[in-house]
Structure formats: C-alpha cells, structure tokens
Amino acid sequence: MQDHQHVPIDIQTSKLLDWLVDRRHCNLKWQSLVLTIREKINTAIQDMPESQEIAQLLSGSYIHYFHCLRIVDLLKGTEASTKNIFGRYSSQRMKDWQEIVSLYEKDNTYLVELCSLLVRNVSYEIPSLKKQIAKCQQLQQEYSRKEEEGQAGAAEMREQFYHSCKQYGITGDNVRRELLALVKDLPSQLAEIGAGAQSLGEAIDLYQACVEFVCDSPTEQVLPMLRYVQKKGNSTVYEWRTGTEPSVVERPQLEEPPEQVQEDEIDWGDFGVEAVSDSGIVAETPGIDWGISLESEAKDAGADKIDWGDDAAAASEITVLETGTEAPEGVARGSDALTLLEYPETRNQFIDELMELEIFLSQRAVEMSEEADILSVSQFQLAPAILQGQTKEKMLSLVSTLQQLIGRLTSLRMQHLFMILASPRYVDRVTEFLQQKLKQSQLLALKKELMVEKQQEALQEQAALEPKLDLLLEKTRELQKLIEADISKRYSGRPVNLMGTSL
C-alpha cells in the first residue's frame, strides 16, 4: 500500500480535460457555469477597495479561482468592520467574492477551468508567440542579407558609372554638358591628329617607291588623302574638293537638344504594397521587382557597352545633312565647311589609307627580319636606294606612329564623339545610358536604407514579444504546479506529472 502511494500519476496535457471528465472530477456542462462566474467577476471588480495588491491581481491577468481566494483574504482585512457576531460579513463586496468562490468550488469548476487555461497556453498561446519571435528573427536575417546585397550592388553600379565616364573622358558631374563640351573640343583634337600625319612623309615616299618598283612603270600617286593631310593638315572639305581655300566658312551649328529631367531628380516610383505579418511586422512583398539583377550585372563582361541595334561600324557611316542652299563661290557651307577628319566620307578614306600604309610597313618589317628567305632579299637588290636604305627598326618605328594615329581616330571615345557631332540627340542616349547606372546605384542605396529600417522594426517587435512570452511561461508553470498539487490531494498525495508541457 505504501508503494502504491508513491507511484506517480502521469497525465498527458492534451488529454487533461478528458481525464477529469472520465474520472468524474467535473461534469460536461462546466463551460456554462464558468460563463456565469466570469460575469460575476466582471461585475465584482467594478467595486473594489484601494489596495496595491488587489490592483496588481486585477491588472493584465486572467482572474482564476486562486486569485479569488487571495482577494477574499485581503477583503477580510479591509472589510473587518462589517463582520457581525456570527462571523458573517454584511459588506456586499465580501458577499460577491464569497459567492464567486462558492460557484468555483461547485463540481470542481475551478479545476477544470485551470486545466482549460493550461491546455490553451501550451497548445496555442505559447507556440504562437514563439512562432512570431522566430518570424522576427528570420526577417532580420533576410533584411540583413538584402542590406549587404544592396550595399554591394550600389557600390558596383557606381563603379561602373565612373568607369564608363572615364572611358568617355568626363567626370560625371553633368554628363550631358560634359559630352557636348567634348564635341566642342573635337576640332582641336582632330587638328592635332592632322598635324601628326606630317611625320609620315618618309613612309609615304617609301610606299610610293615600292609600288613603282614592283609595277615596273610610273603609276599615279598612292594615298592621296594621306598625302594631302600630310602637307595641308586637317583642312576643310571645300579646300580638298576645289583646291582653293574658302574665303568664308559657315560651319553647321551644333544643335543642342532641350534639357531633359534634372539628373538629381530621380523618380523612385512606388516600392509596392507592403504586407503585414501576424506579428505586426511590415514585410516586403515578394512580388516587388526592383529591376536589378546583381548576379547578371557581376557576370556581364559587356556591361559598359551600348547596344545601338546596328553594327558598330555604322558610327562611321553617319552623314551630316547639308544645310541651306547651294553656296556661292568661295563660301564653305554645310558639309564643305567641315574638316576632312570631321566629315565621315573623307575621314574613312583617311583611316583606310593609314591602315594600308601600316600593313605595307609591317610586311616590309617581316621581310627584313632574319627569318626572311633569300629570294625576297634578292628581289630588292635592284630596288631604289630609298627601299634598300631602310632597316627593320625604322619600319617598326613608322608602324608604331601609324598605329598611334589609327588608335586615336578609332577609339571608342572618338567614335561616340563623331556620332554626337553627326546627331546631337545621340547625347541623350549616351546620357541616359550613363545616368541609368547612377540611378540604379542610388536605388540600391535607398533599398539598403529601407532594409535597415525594416530590420530595426523586426528587432523592436521581437523585443516587445519576448517579455510577453516570458510572462506567459511563468504563469503557465504556476498553473501547472497548482493543478498537479490539487489533483495530488484527491489521490492521497500521490505525485502527479503533467506530460507534454515542454515549459
């Protein structure tokens, strides 16, 4: 018998209410009686004496049977003057709370209510709070990751912007104006290139002599455009065409298209609808399209190139429309007023002749190398002195000079300047291309700031939920101890264990 009293009673918490009903500790209609008790409690708490402990019991917690017992004990002190010779109280306050205690004890209603509270806390309230806290922590990690992505993406796009600006030779402070300013400086740059052609006289004569020697008969002069620029410099098309210098040059006016939206006025649009989670956290809607793929930007080797739809060679095929009517004699107007290196047709001829001369000199350097066969050397024994008096080093030096001139004329920066010169509205396309990178950088920076704010909101929400969870766990543990102690009394002090609470 003594061993039987020490055998613990293990009760699964989820089956606790059924266990009480099956063992007739309470009846099936306990819920209706609990509703009546709750109504009486709500009425009784409207008239309570001034007491700090009573106020603490009534604030922010569910009032159950053991709270009522404590309130009755406190009222015995405050309502002592209303006690008669028979030990009863005439105070309505005391009568109300004594009635509530009596109703609780009827059919052990207090016990089943406590068990109901315990089951609800263990099965619903505590898991719900834990889920909300876990959601806050998940959001913080997600926002932290997006913050890092936004920061890295903003830096990458900004670097691409300045790298592209460097290719164009501008600072990027005002892309449009700087590009137009470069076009205004283009004539002086082309004049320098034309002046650089003056050092090619020896190479041109060498090529002319070789052609005459190989053909074994007098021929017309080779490289006419290159010869002309070498002697006259970068003159006007009119002078090249007519052979006389114009008395008046009416250059086409560079049309400046109207200013577009200010560069610092960026329309961020709408960040989309935000969804509110169960915990009150405002989470970013998954459907938001930021229009930016960080992975593709990092892998795209041609990110700094503009796709203009046609072949890149089309840049050199743009023709400038002639303005006005036929010009009188001595007046250079329209395309005639442009310089040879500004006008696409003559510029292309100049570049072609530079490349032709470069190929010739490169081939002569190869023929003069040590690996050259004896036959090619013997062929030039009867050549003019200008051909025989050359060295490989001299050929390579001339080739280097030609390559520098070709490189300056065909560089990506120069191609874009020629396109701007031919079509000023091309400036807007380049400006939009460059500004798009800067706008994307600023958008990613703003997104990063937004992620920081959302991360802070999630952290604050977690900080507000954790004390609630701690308080609920404490109250639930108290309920568990009270229930285990009450059931233990009904079974001669046998230990009672409520299983599955995981507190």
UniProtKB/Swiss-Prot annotation:
In which tissues is this gene expressed? Answer: Widely expressed with higher expression in secretory tissues.
The record's GO CC annotations read: centrosome; cytoplasm; cytosol; endoplasmic reticulum membrane; microtubule; nucleolus; nucleus; protein-containing complex
GO BP annotation list = apoptotic nuclear changes; cell population proliferation; definitive erythrocyte differentiation; endoplasmic reticulum unfolded protein response; liver development; mitotic G2 DNA damage checkpoint signaling; mitotic G2/M transition checkpoint; negative regulation of MAP kinase activity
Q: Where in the cell is it found?
A: Endoplasmic reticulum membrane; Cytoplasm; Nucleus; Cytoplasm, Cytoskeleton, Microtubule organizing center, Centrosome
What does UniProt say on post-translational modification here? May be phosphorylated by CDK5. Ubiquitinated. Probably triggers proteasomal degradation and is negatively regulated by UFL1.
Q: Where is this region: RPL10a-binding domain (RBD)?
A: 352-367
Instruction: State the phenotype upon gene disruption.
Output: Prenatal lethality, probably caused by severe liver hypoplasia. 16.5 dpc mutant embryos also show defects in definitive erythropoiesis. Conditional knockout mice lacking Cdk5rap3 in hepatocytes causes lethality after weaning -specific Cdk5rap3 display liver hypoplasia and die after weaning.
| Domain of life according to the entry | Eukaryota
Keywords on record: Cytoplasm, Cytoskeleton, Endoplasmic reticulum, Isopeptide bond, Membrane, Nucleus, Phosphoprotein, Ubl conjugation, Ubl conjugation pathway
Indicate the principal place this protein occupies in or around the cell.
Answer: endoplasmic reticulum
A GO molecular function term, named singly, is: ubiquitin-like protein ligase binding
Location in chain, cross-link Glycyl lysine isopeptide (Lys-Gly) (interchain with G-Cter in SUMO2): K447
The short sequence motif called Shuffled ATG8-binding motif 3 sits at 306-309
Q: Which cystines does this chain contain?
A: none
**Residue ranges annotated as motif Shuffled ATG8-binding motif 2:** 288-291
Positions of region (Required for interaction with UFL1 and mediates interaction with CHEK1): 268-503
Does this entry carry the keyword Ubl conjugation?
A: yes
Motif: Shuffled ATG8-binding motif 1; annotated at 266-269
Q: Any keyword Transcription regulation?
A: no
Q: Describe the task this protein carries out.
A: Substrate adapter of E3 ligase complexes mediating ufmylation, the covalent attachment of the ubiquitin-like modifier UFM1 to substrate proteins, and which is involved in various processes, such as ribosome recycling and reticulophagy (also called ER-phagy). As part of the UREL complex, plays a key role in ribosome recycling by promoting mono-ufmylation of RPL26/uL24 subunit of the 60S ribosome.
Q: What is known of its domains?
A: The shuffled ATG8-binding motifs mediate interaction with both ATG8 family protein and UFM1.
Which family is this protein grouped under? Answer: Belongs to the CDK5RAP3 family.
- Assembly with partners or alone: Substrate adapter component of the UFM1 ribosome E3 ligase (UREL) complex, composed of UFL1, DDRGK1 and CDK5RAP3. Interaction with UFL1 anchors CDK5RAP3 in the cytoplasm, preventing its translocation to the nucleus which allows expression of the CCND1 cyclin and progression of cells through the G1/S transition. Interacts with ATG8 family proteins MAP1LC3A, MAP1LC3B, GABARAP, GABARAPL1 and GABARAPL2. Interacts with CDK5R1; competes with CDK5RAP1 and CDK5RAP2. Interacts with RELA. Interacts with CHEK1; may negatively regulate CHEK1 and thereby stimulate entry into mitosis.
Entries under PANTHER family matching the protein: CDK5 REGULATORY SUBUNIT-ASSOCIATED PROTEIN 3
Supply the name of the protein: CDK5 regulatory subunit-associated protein 3
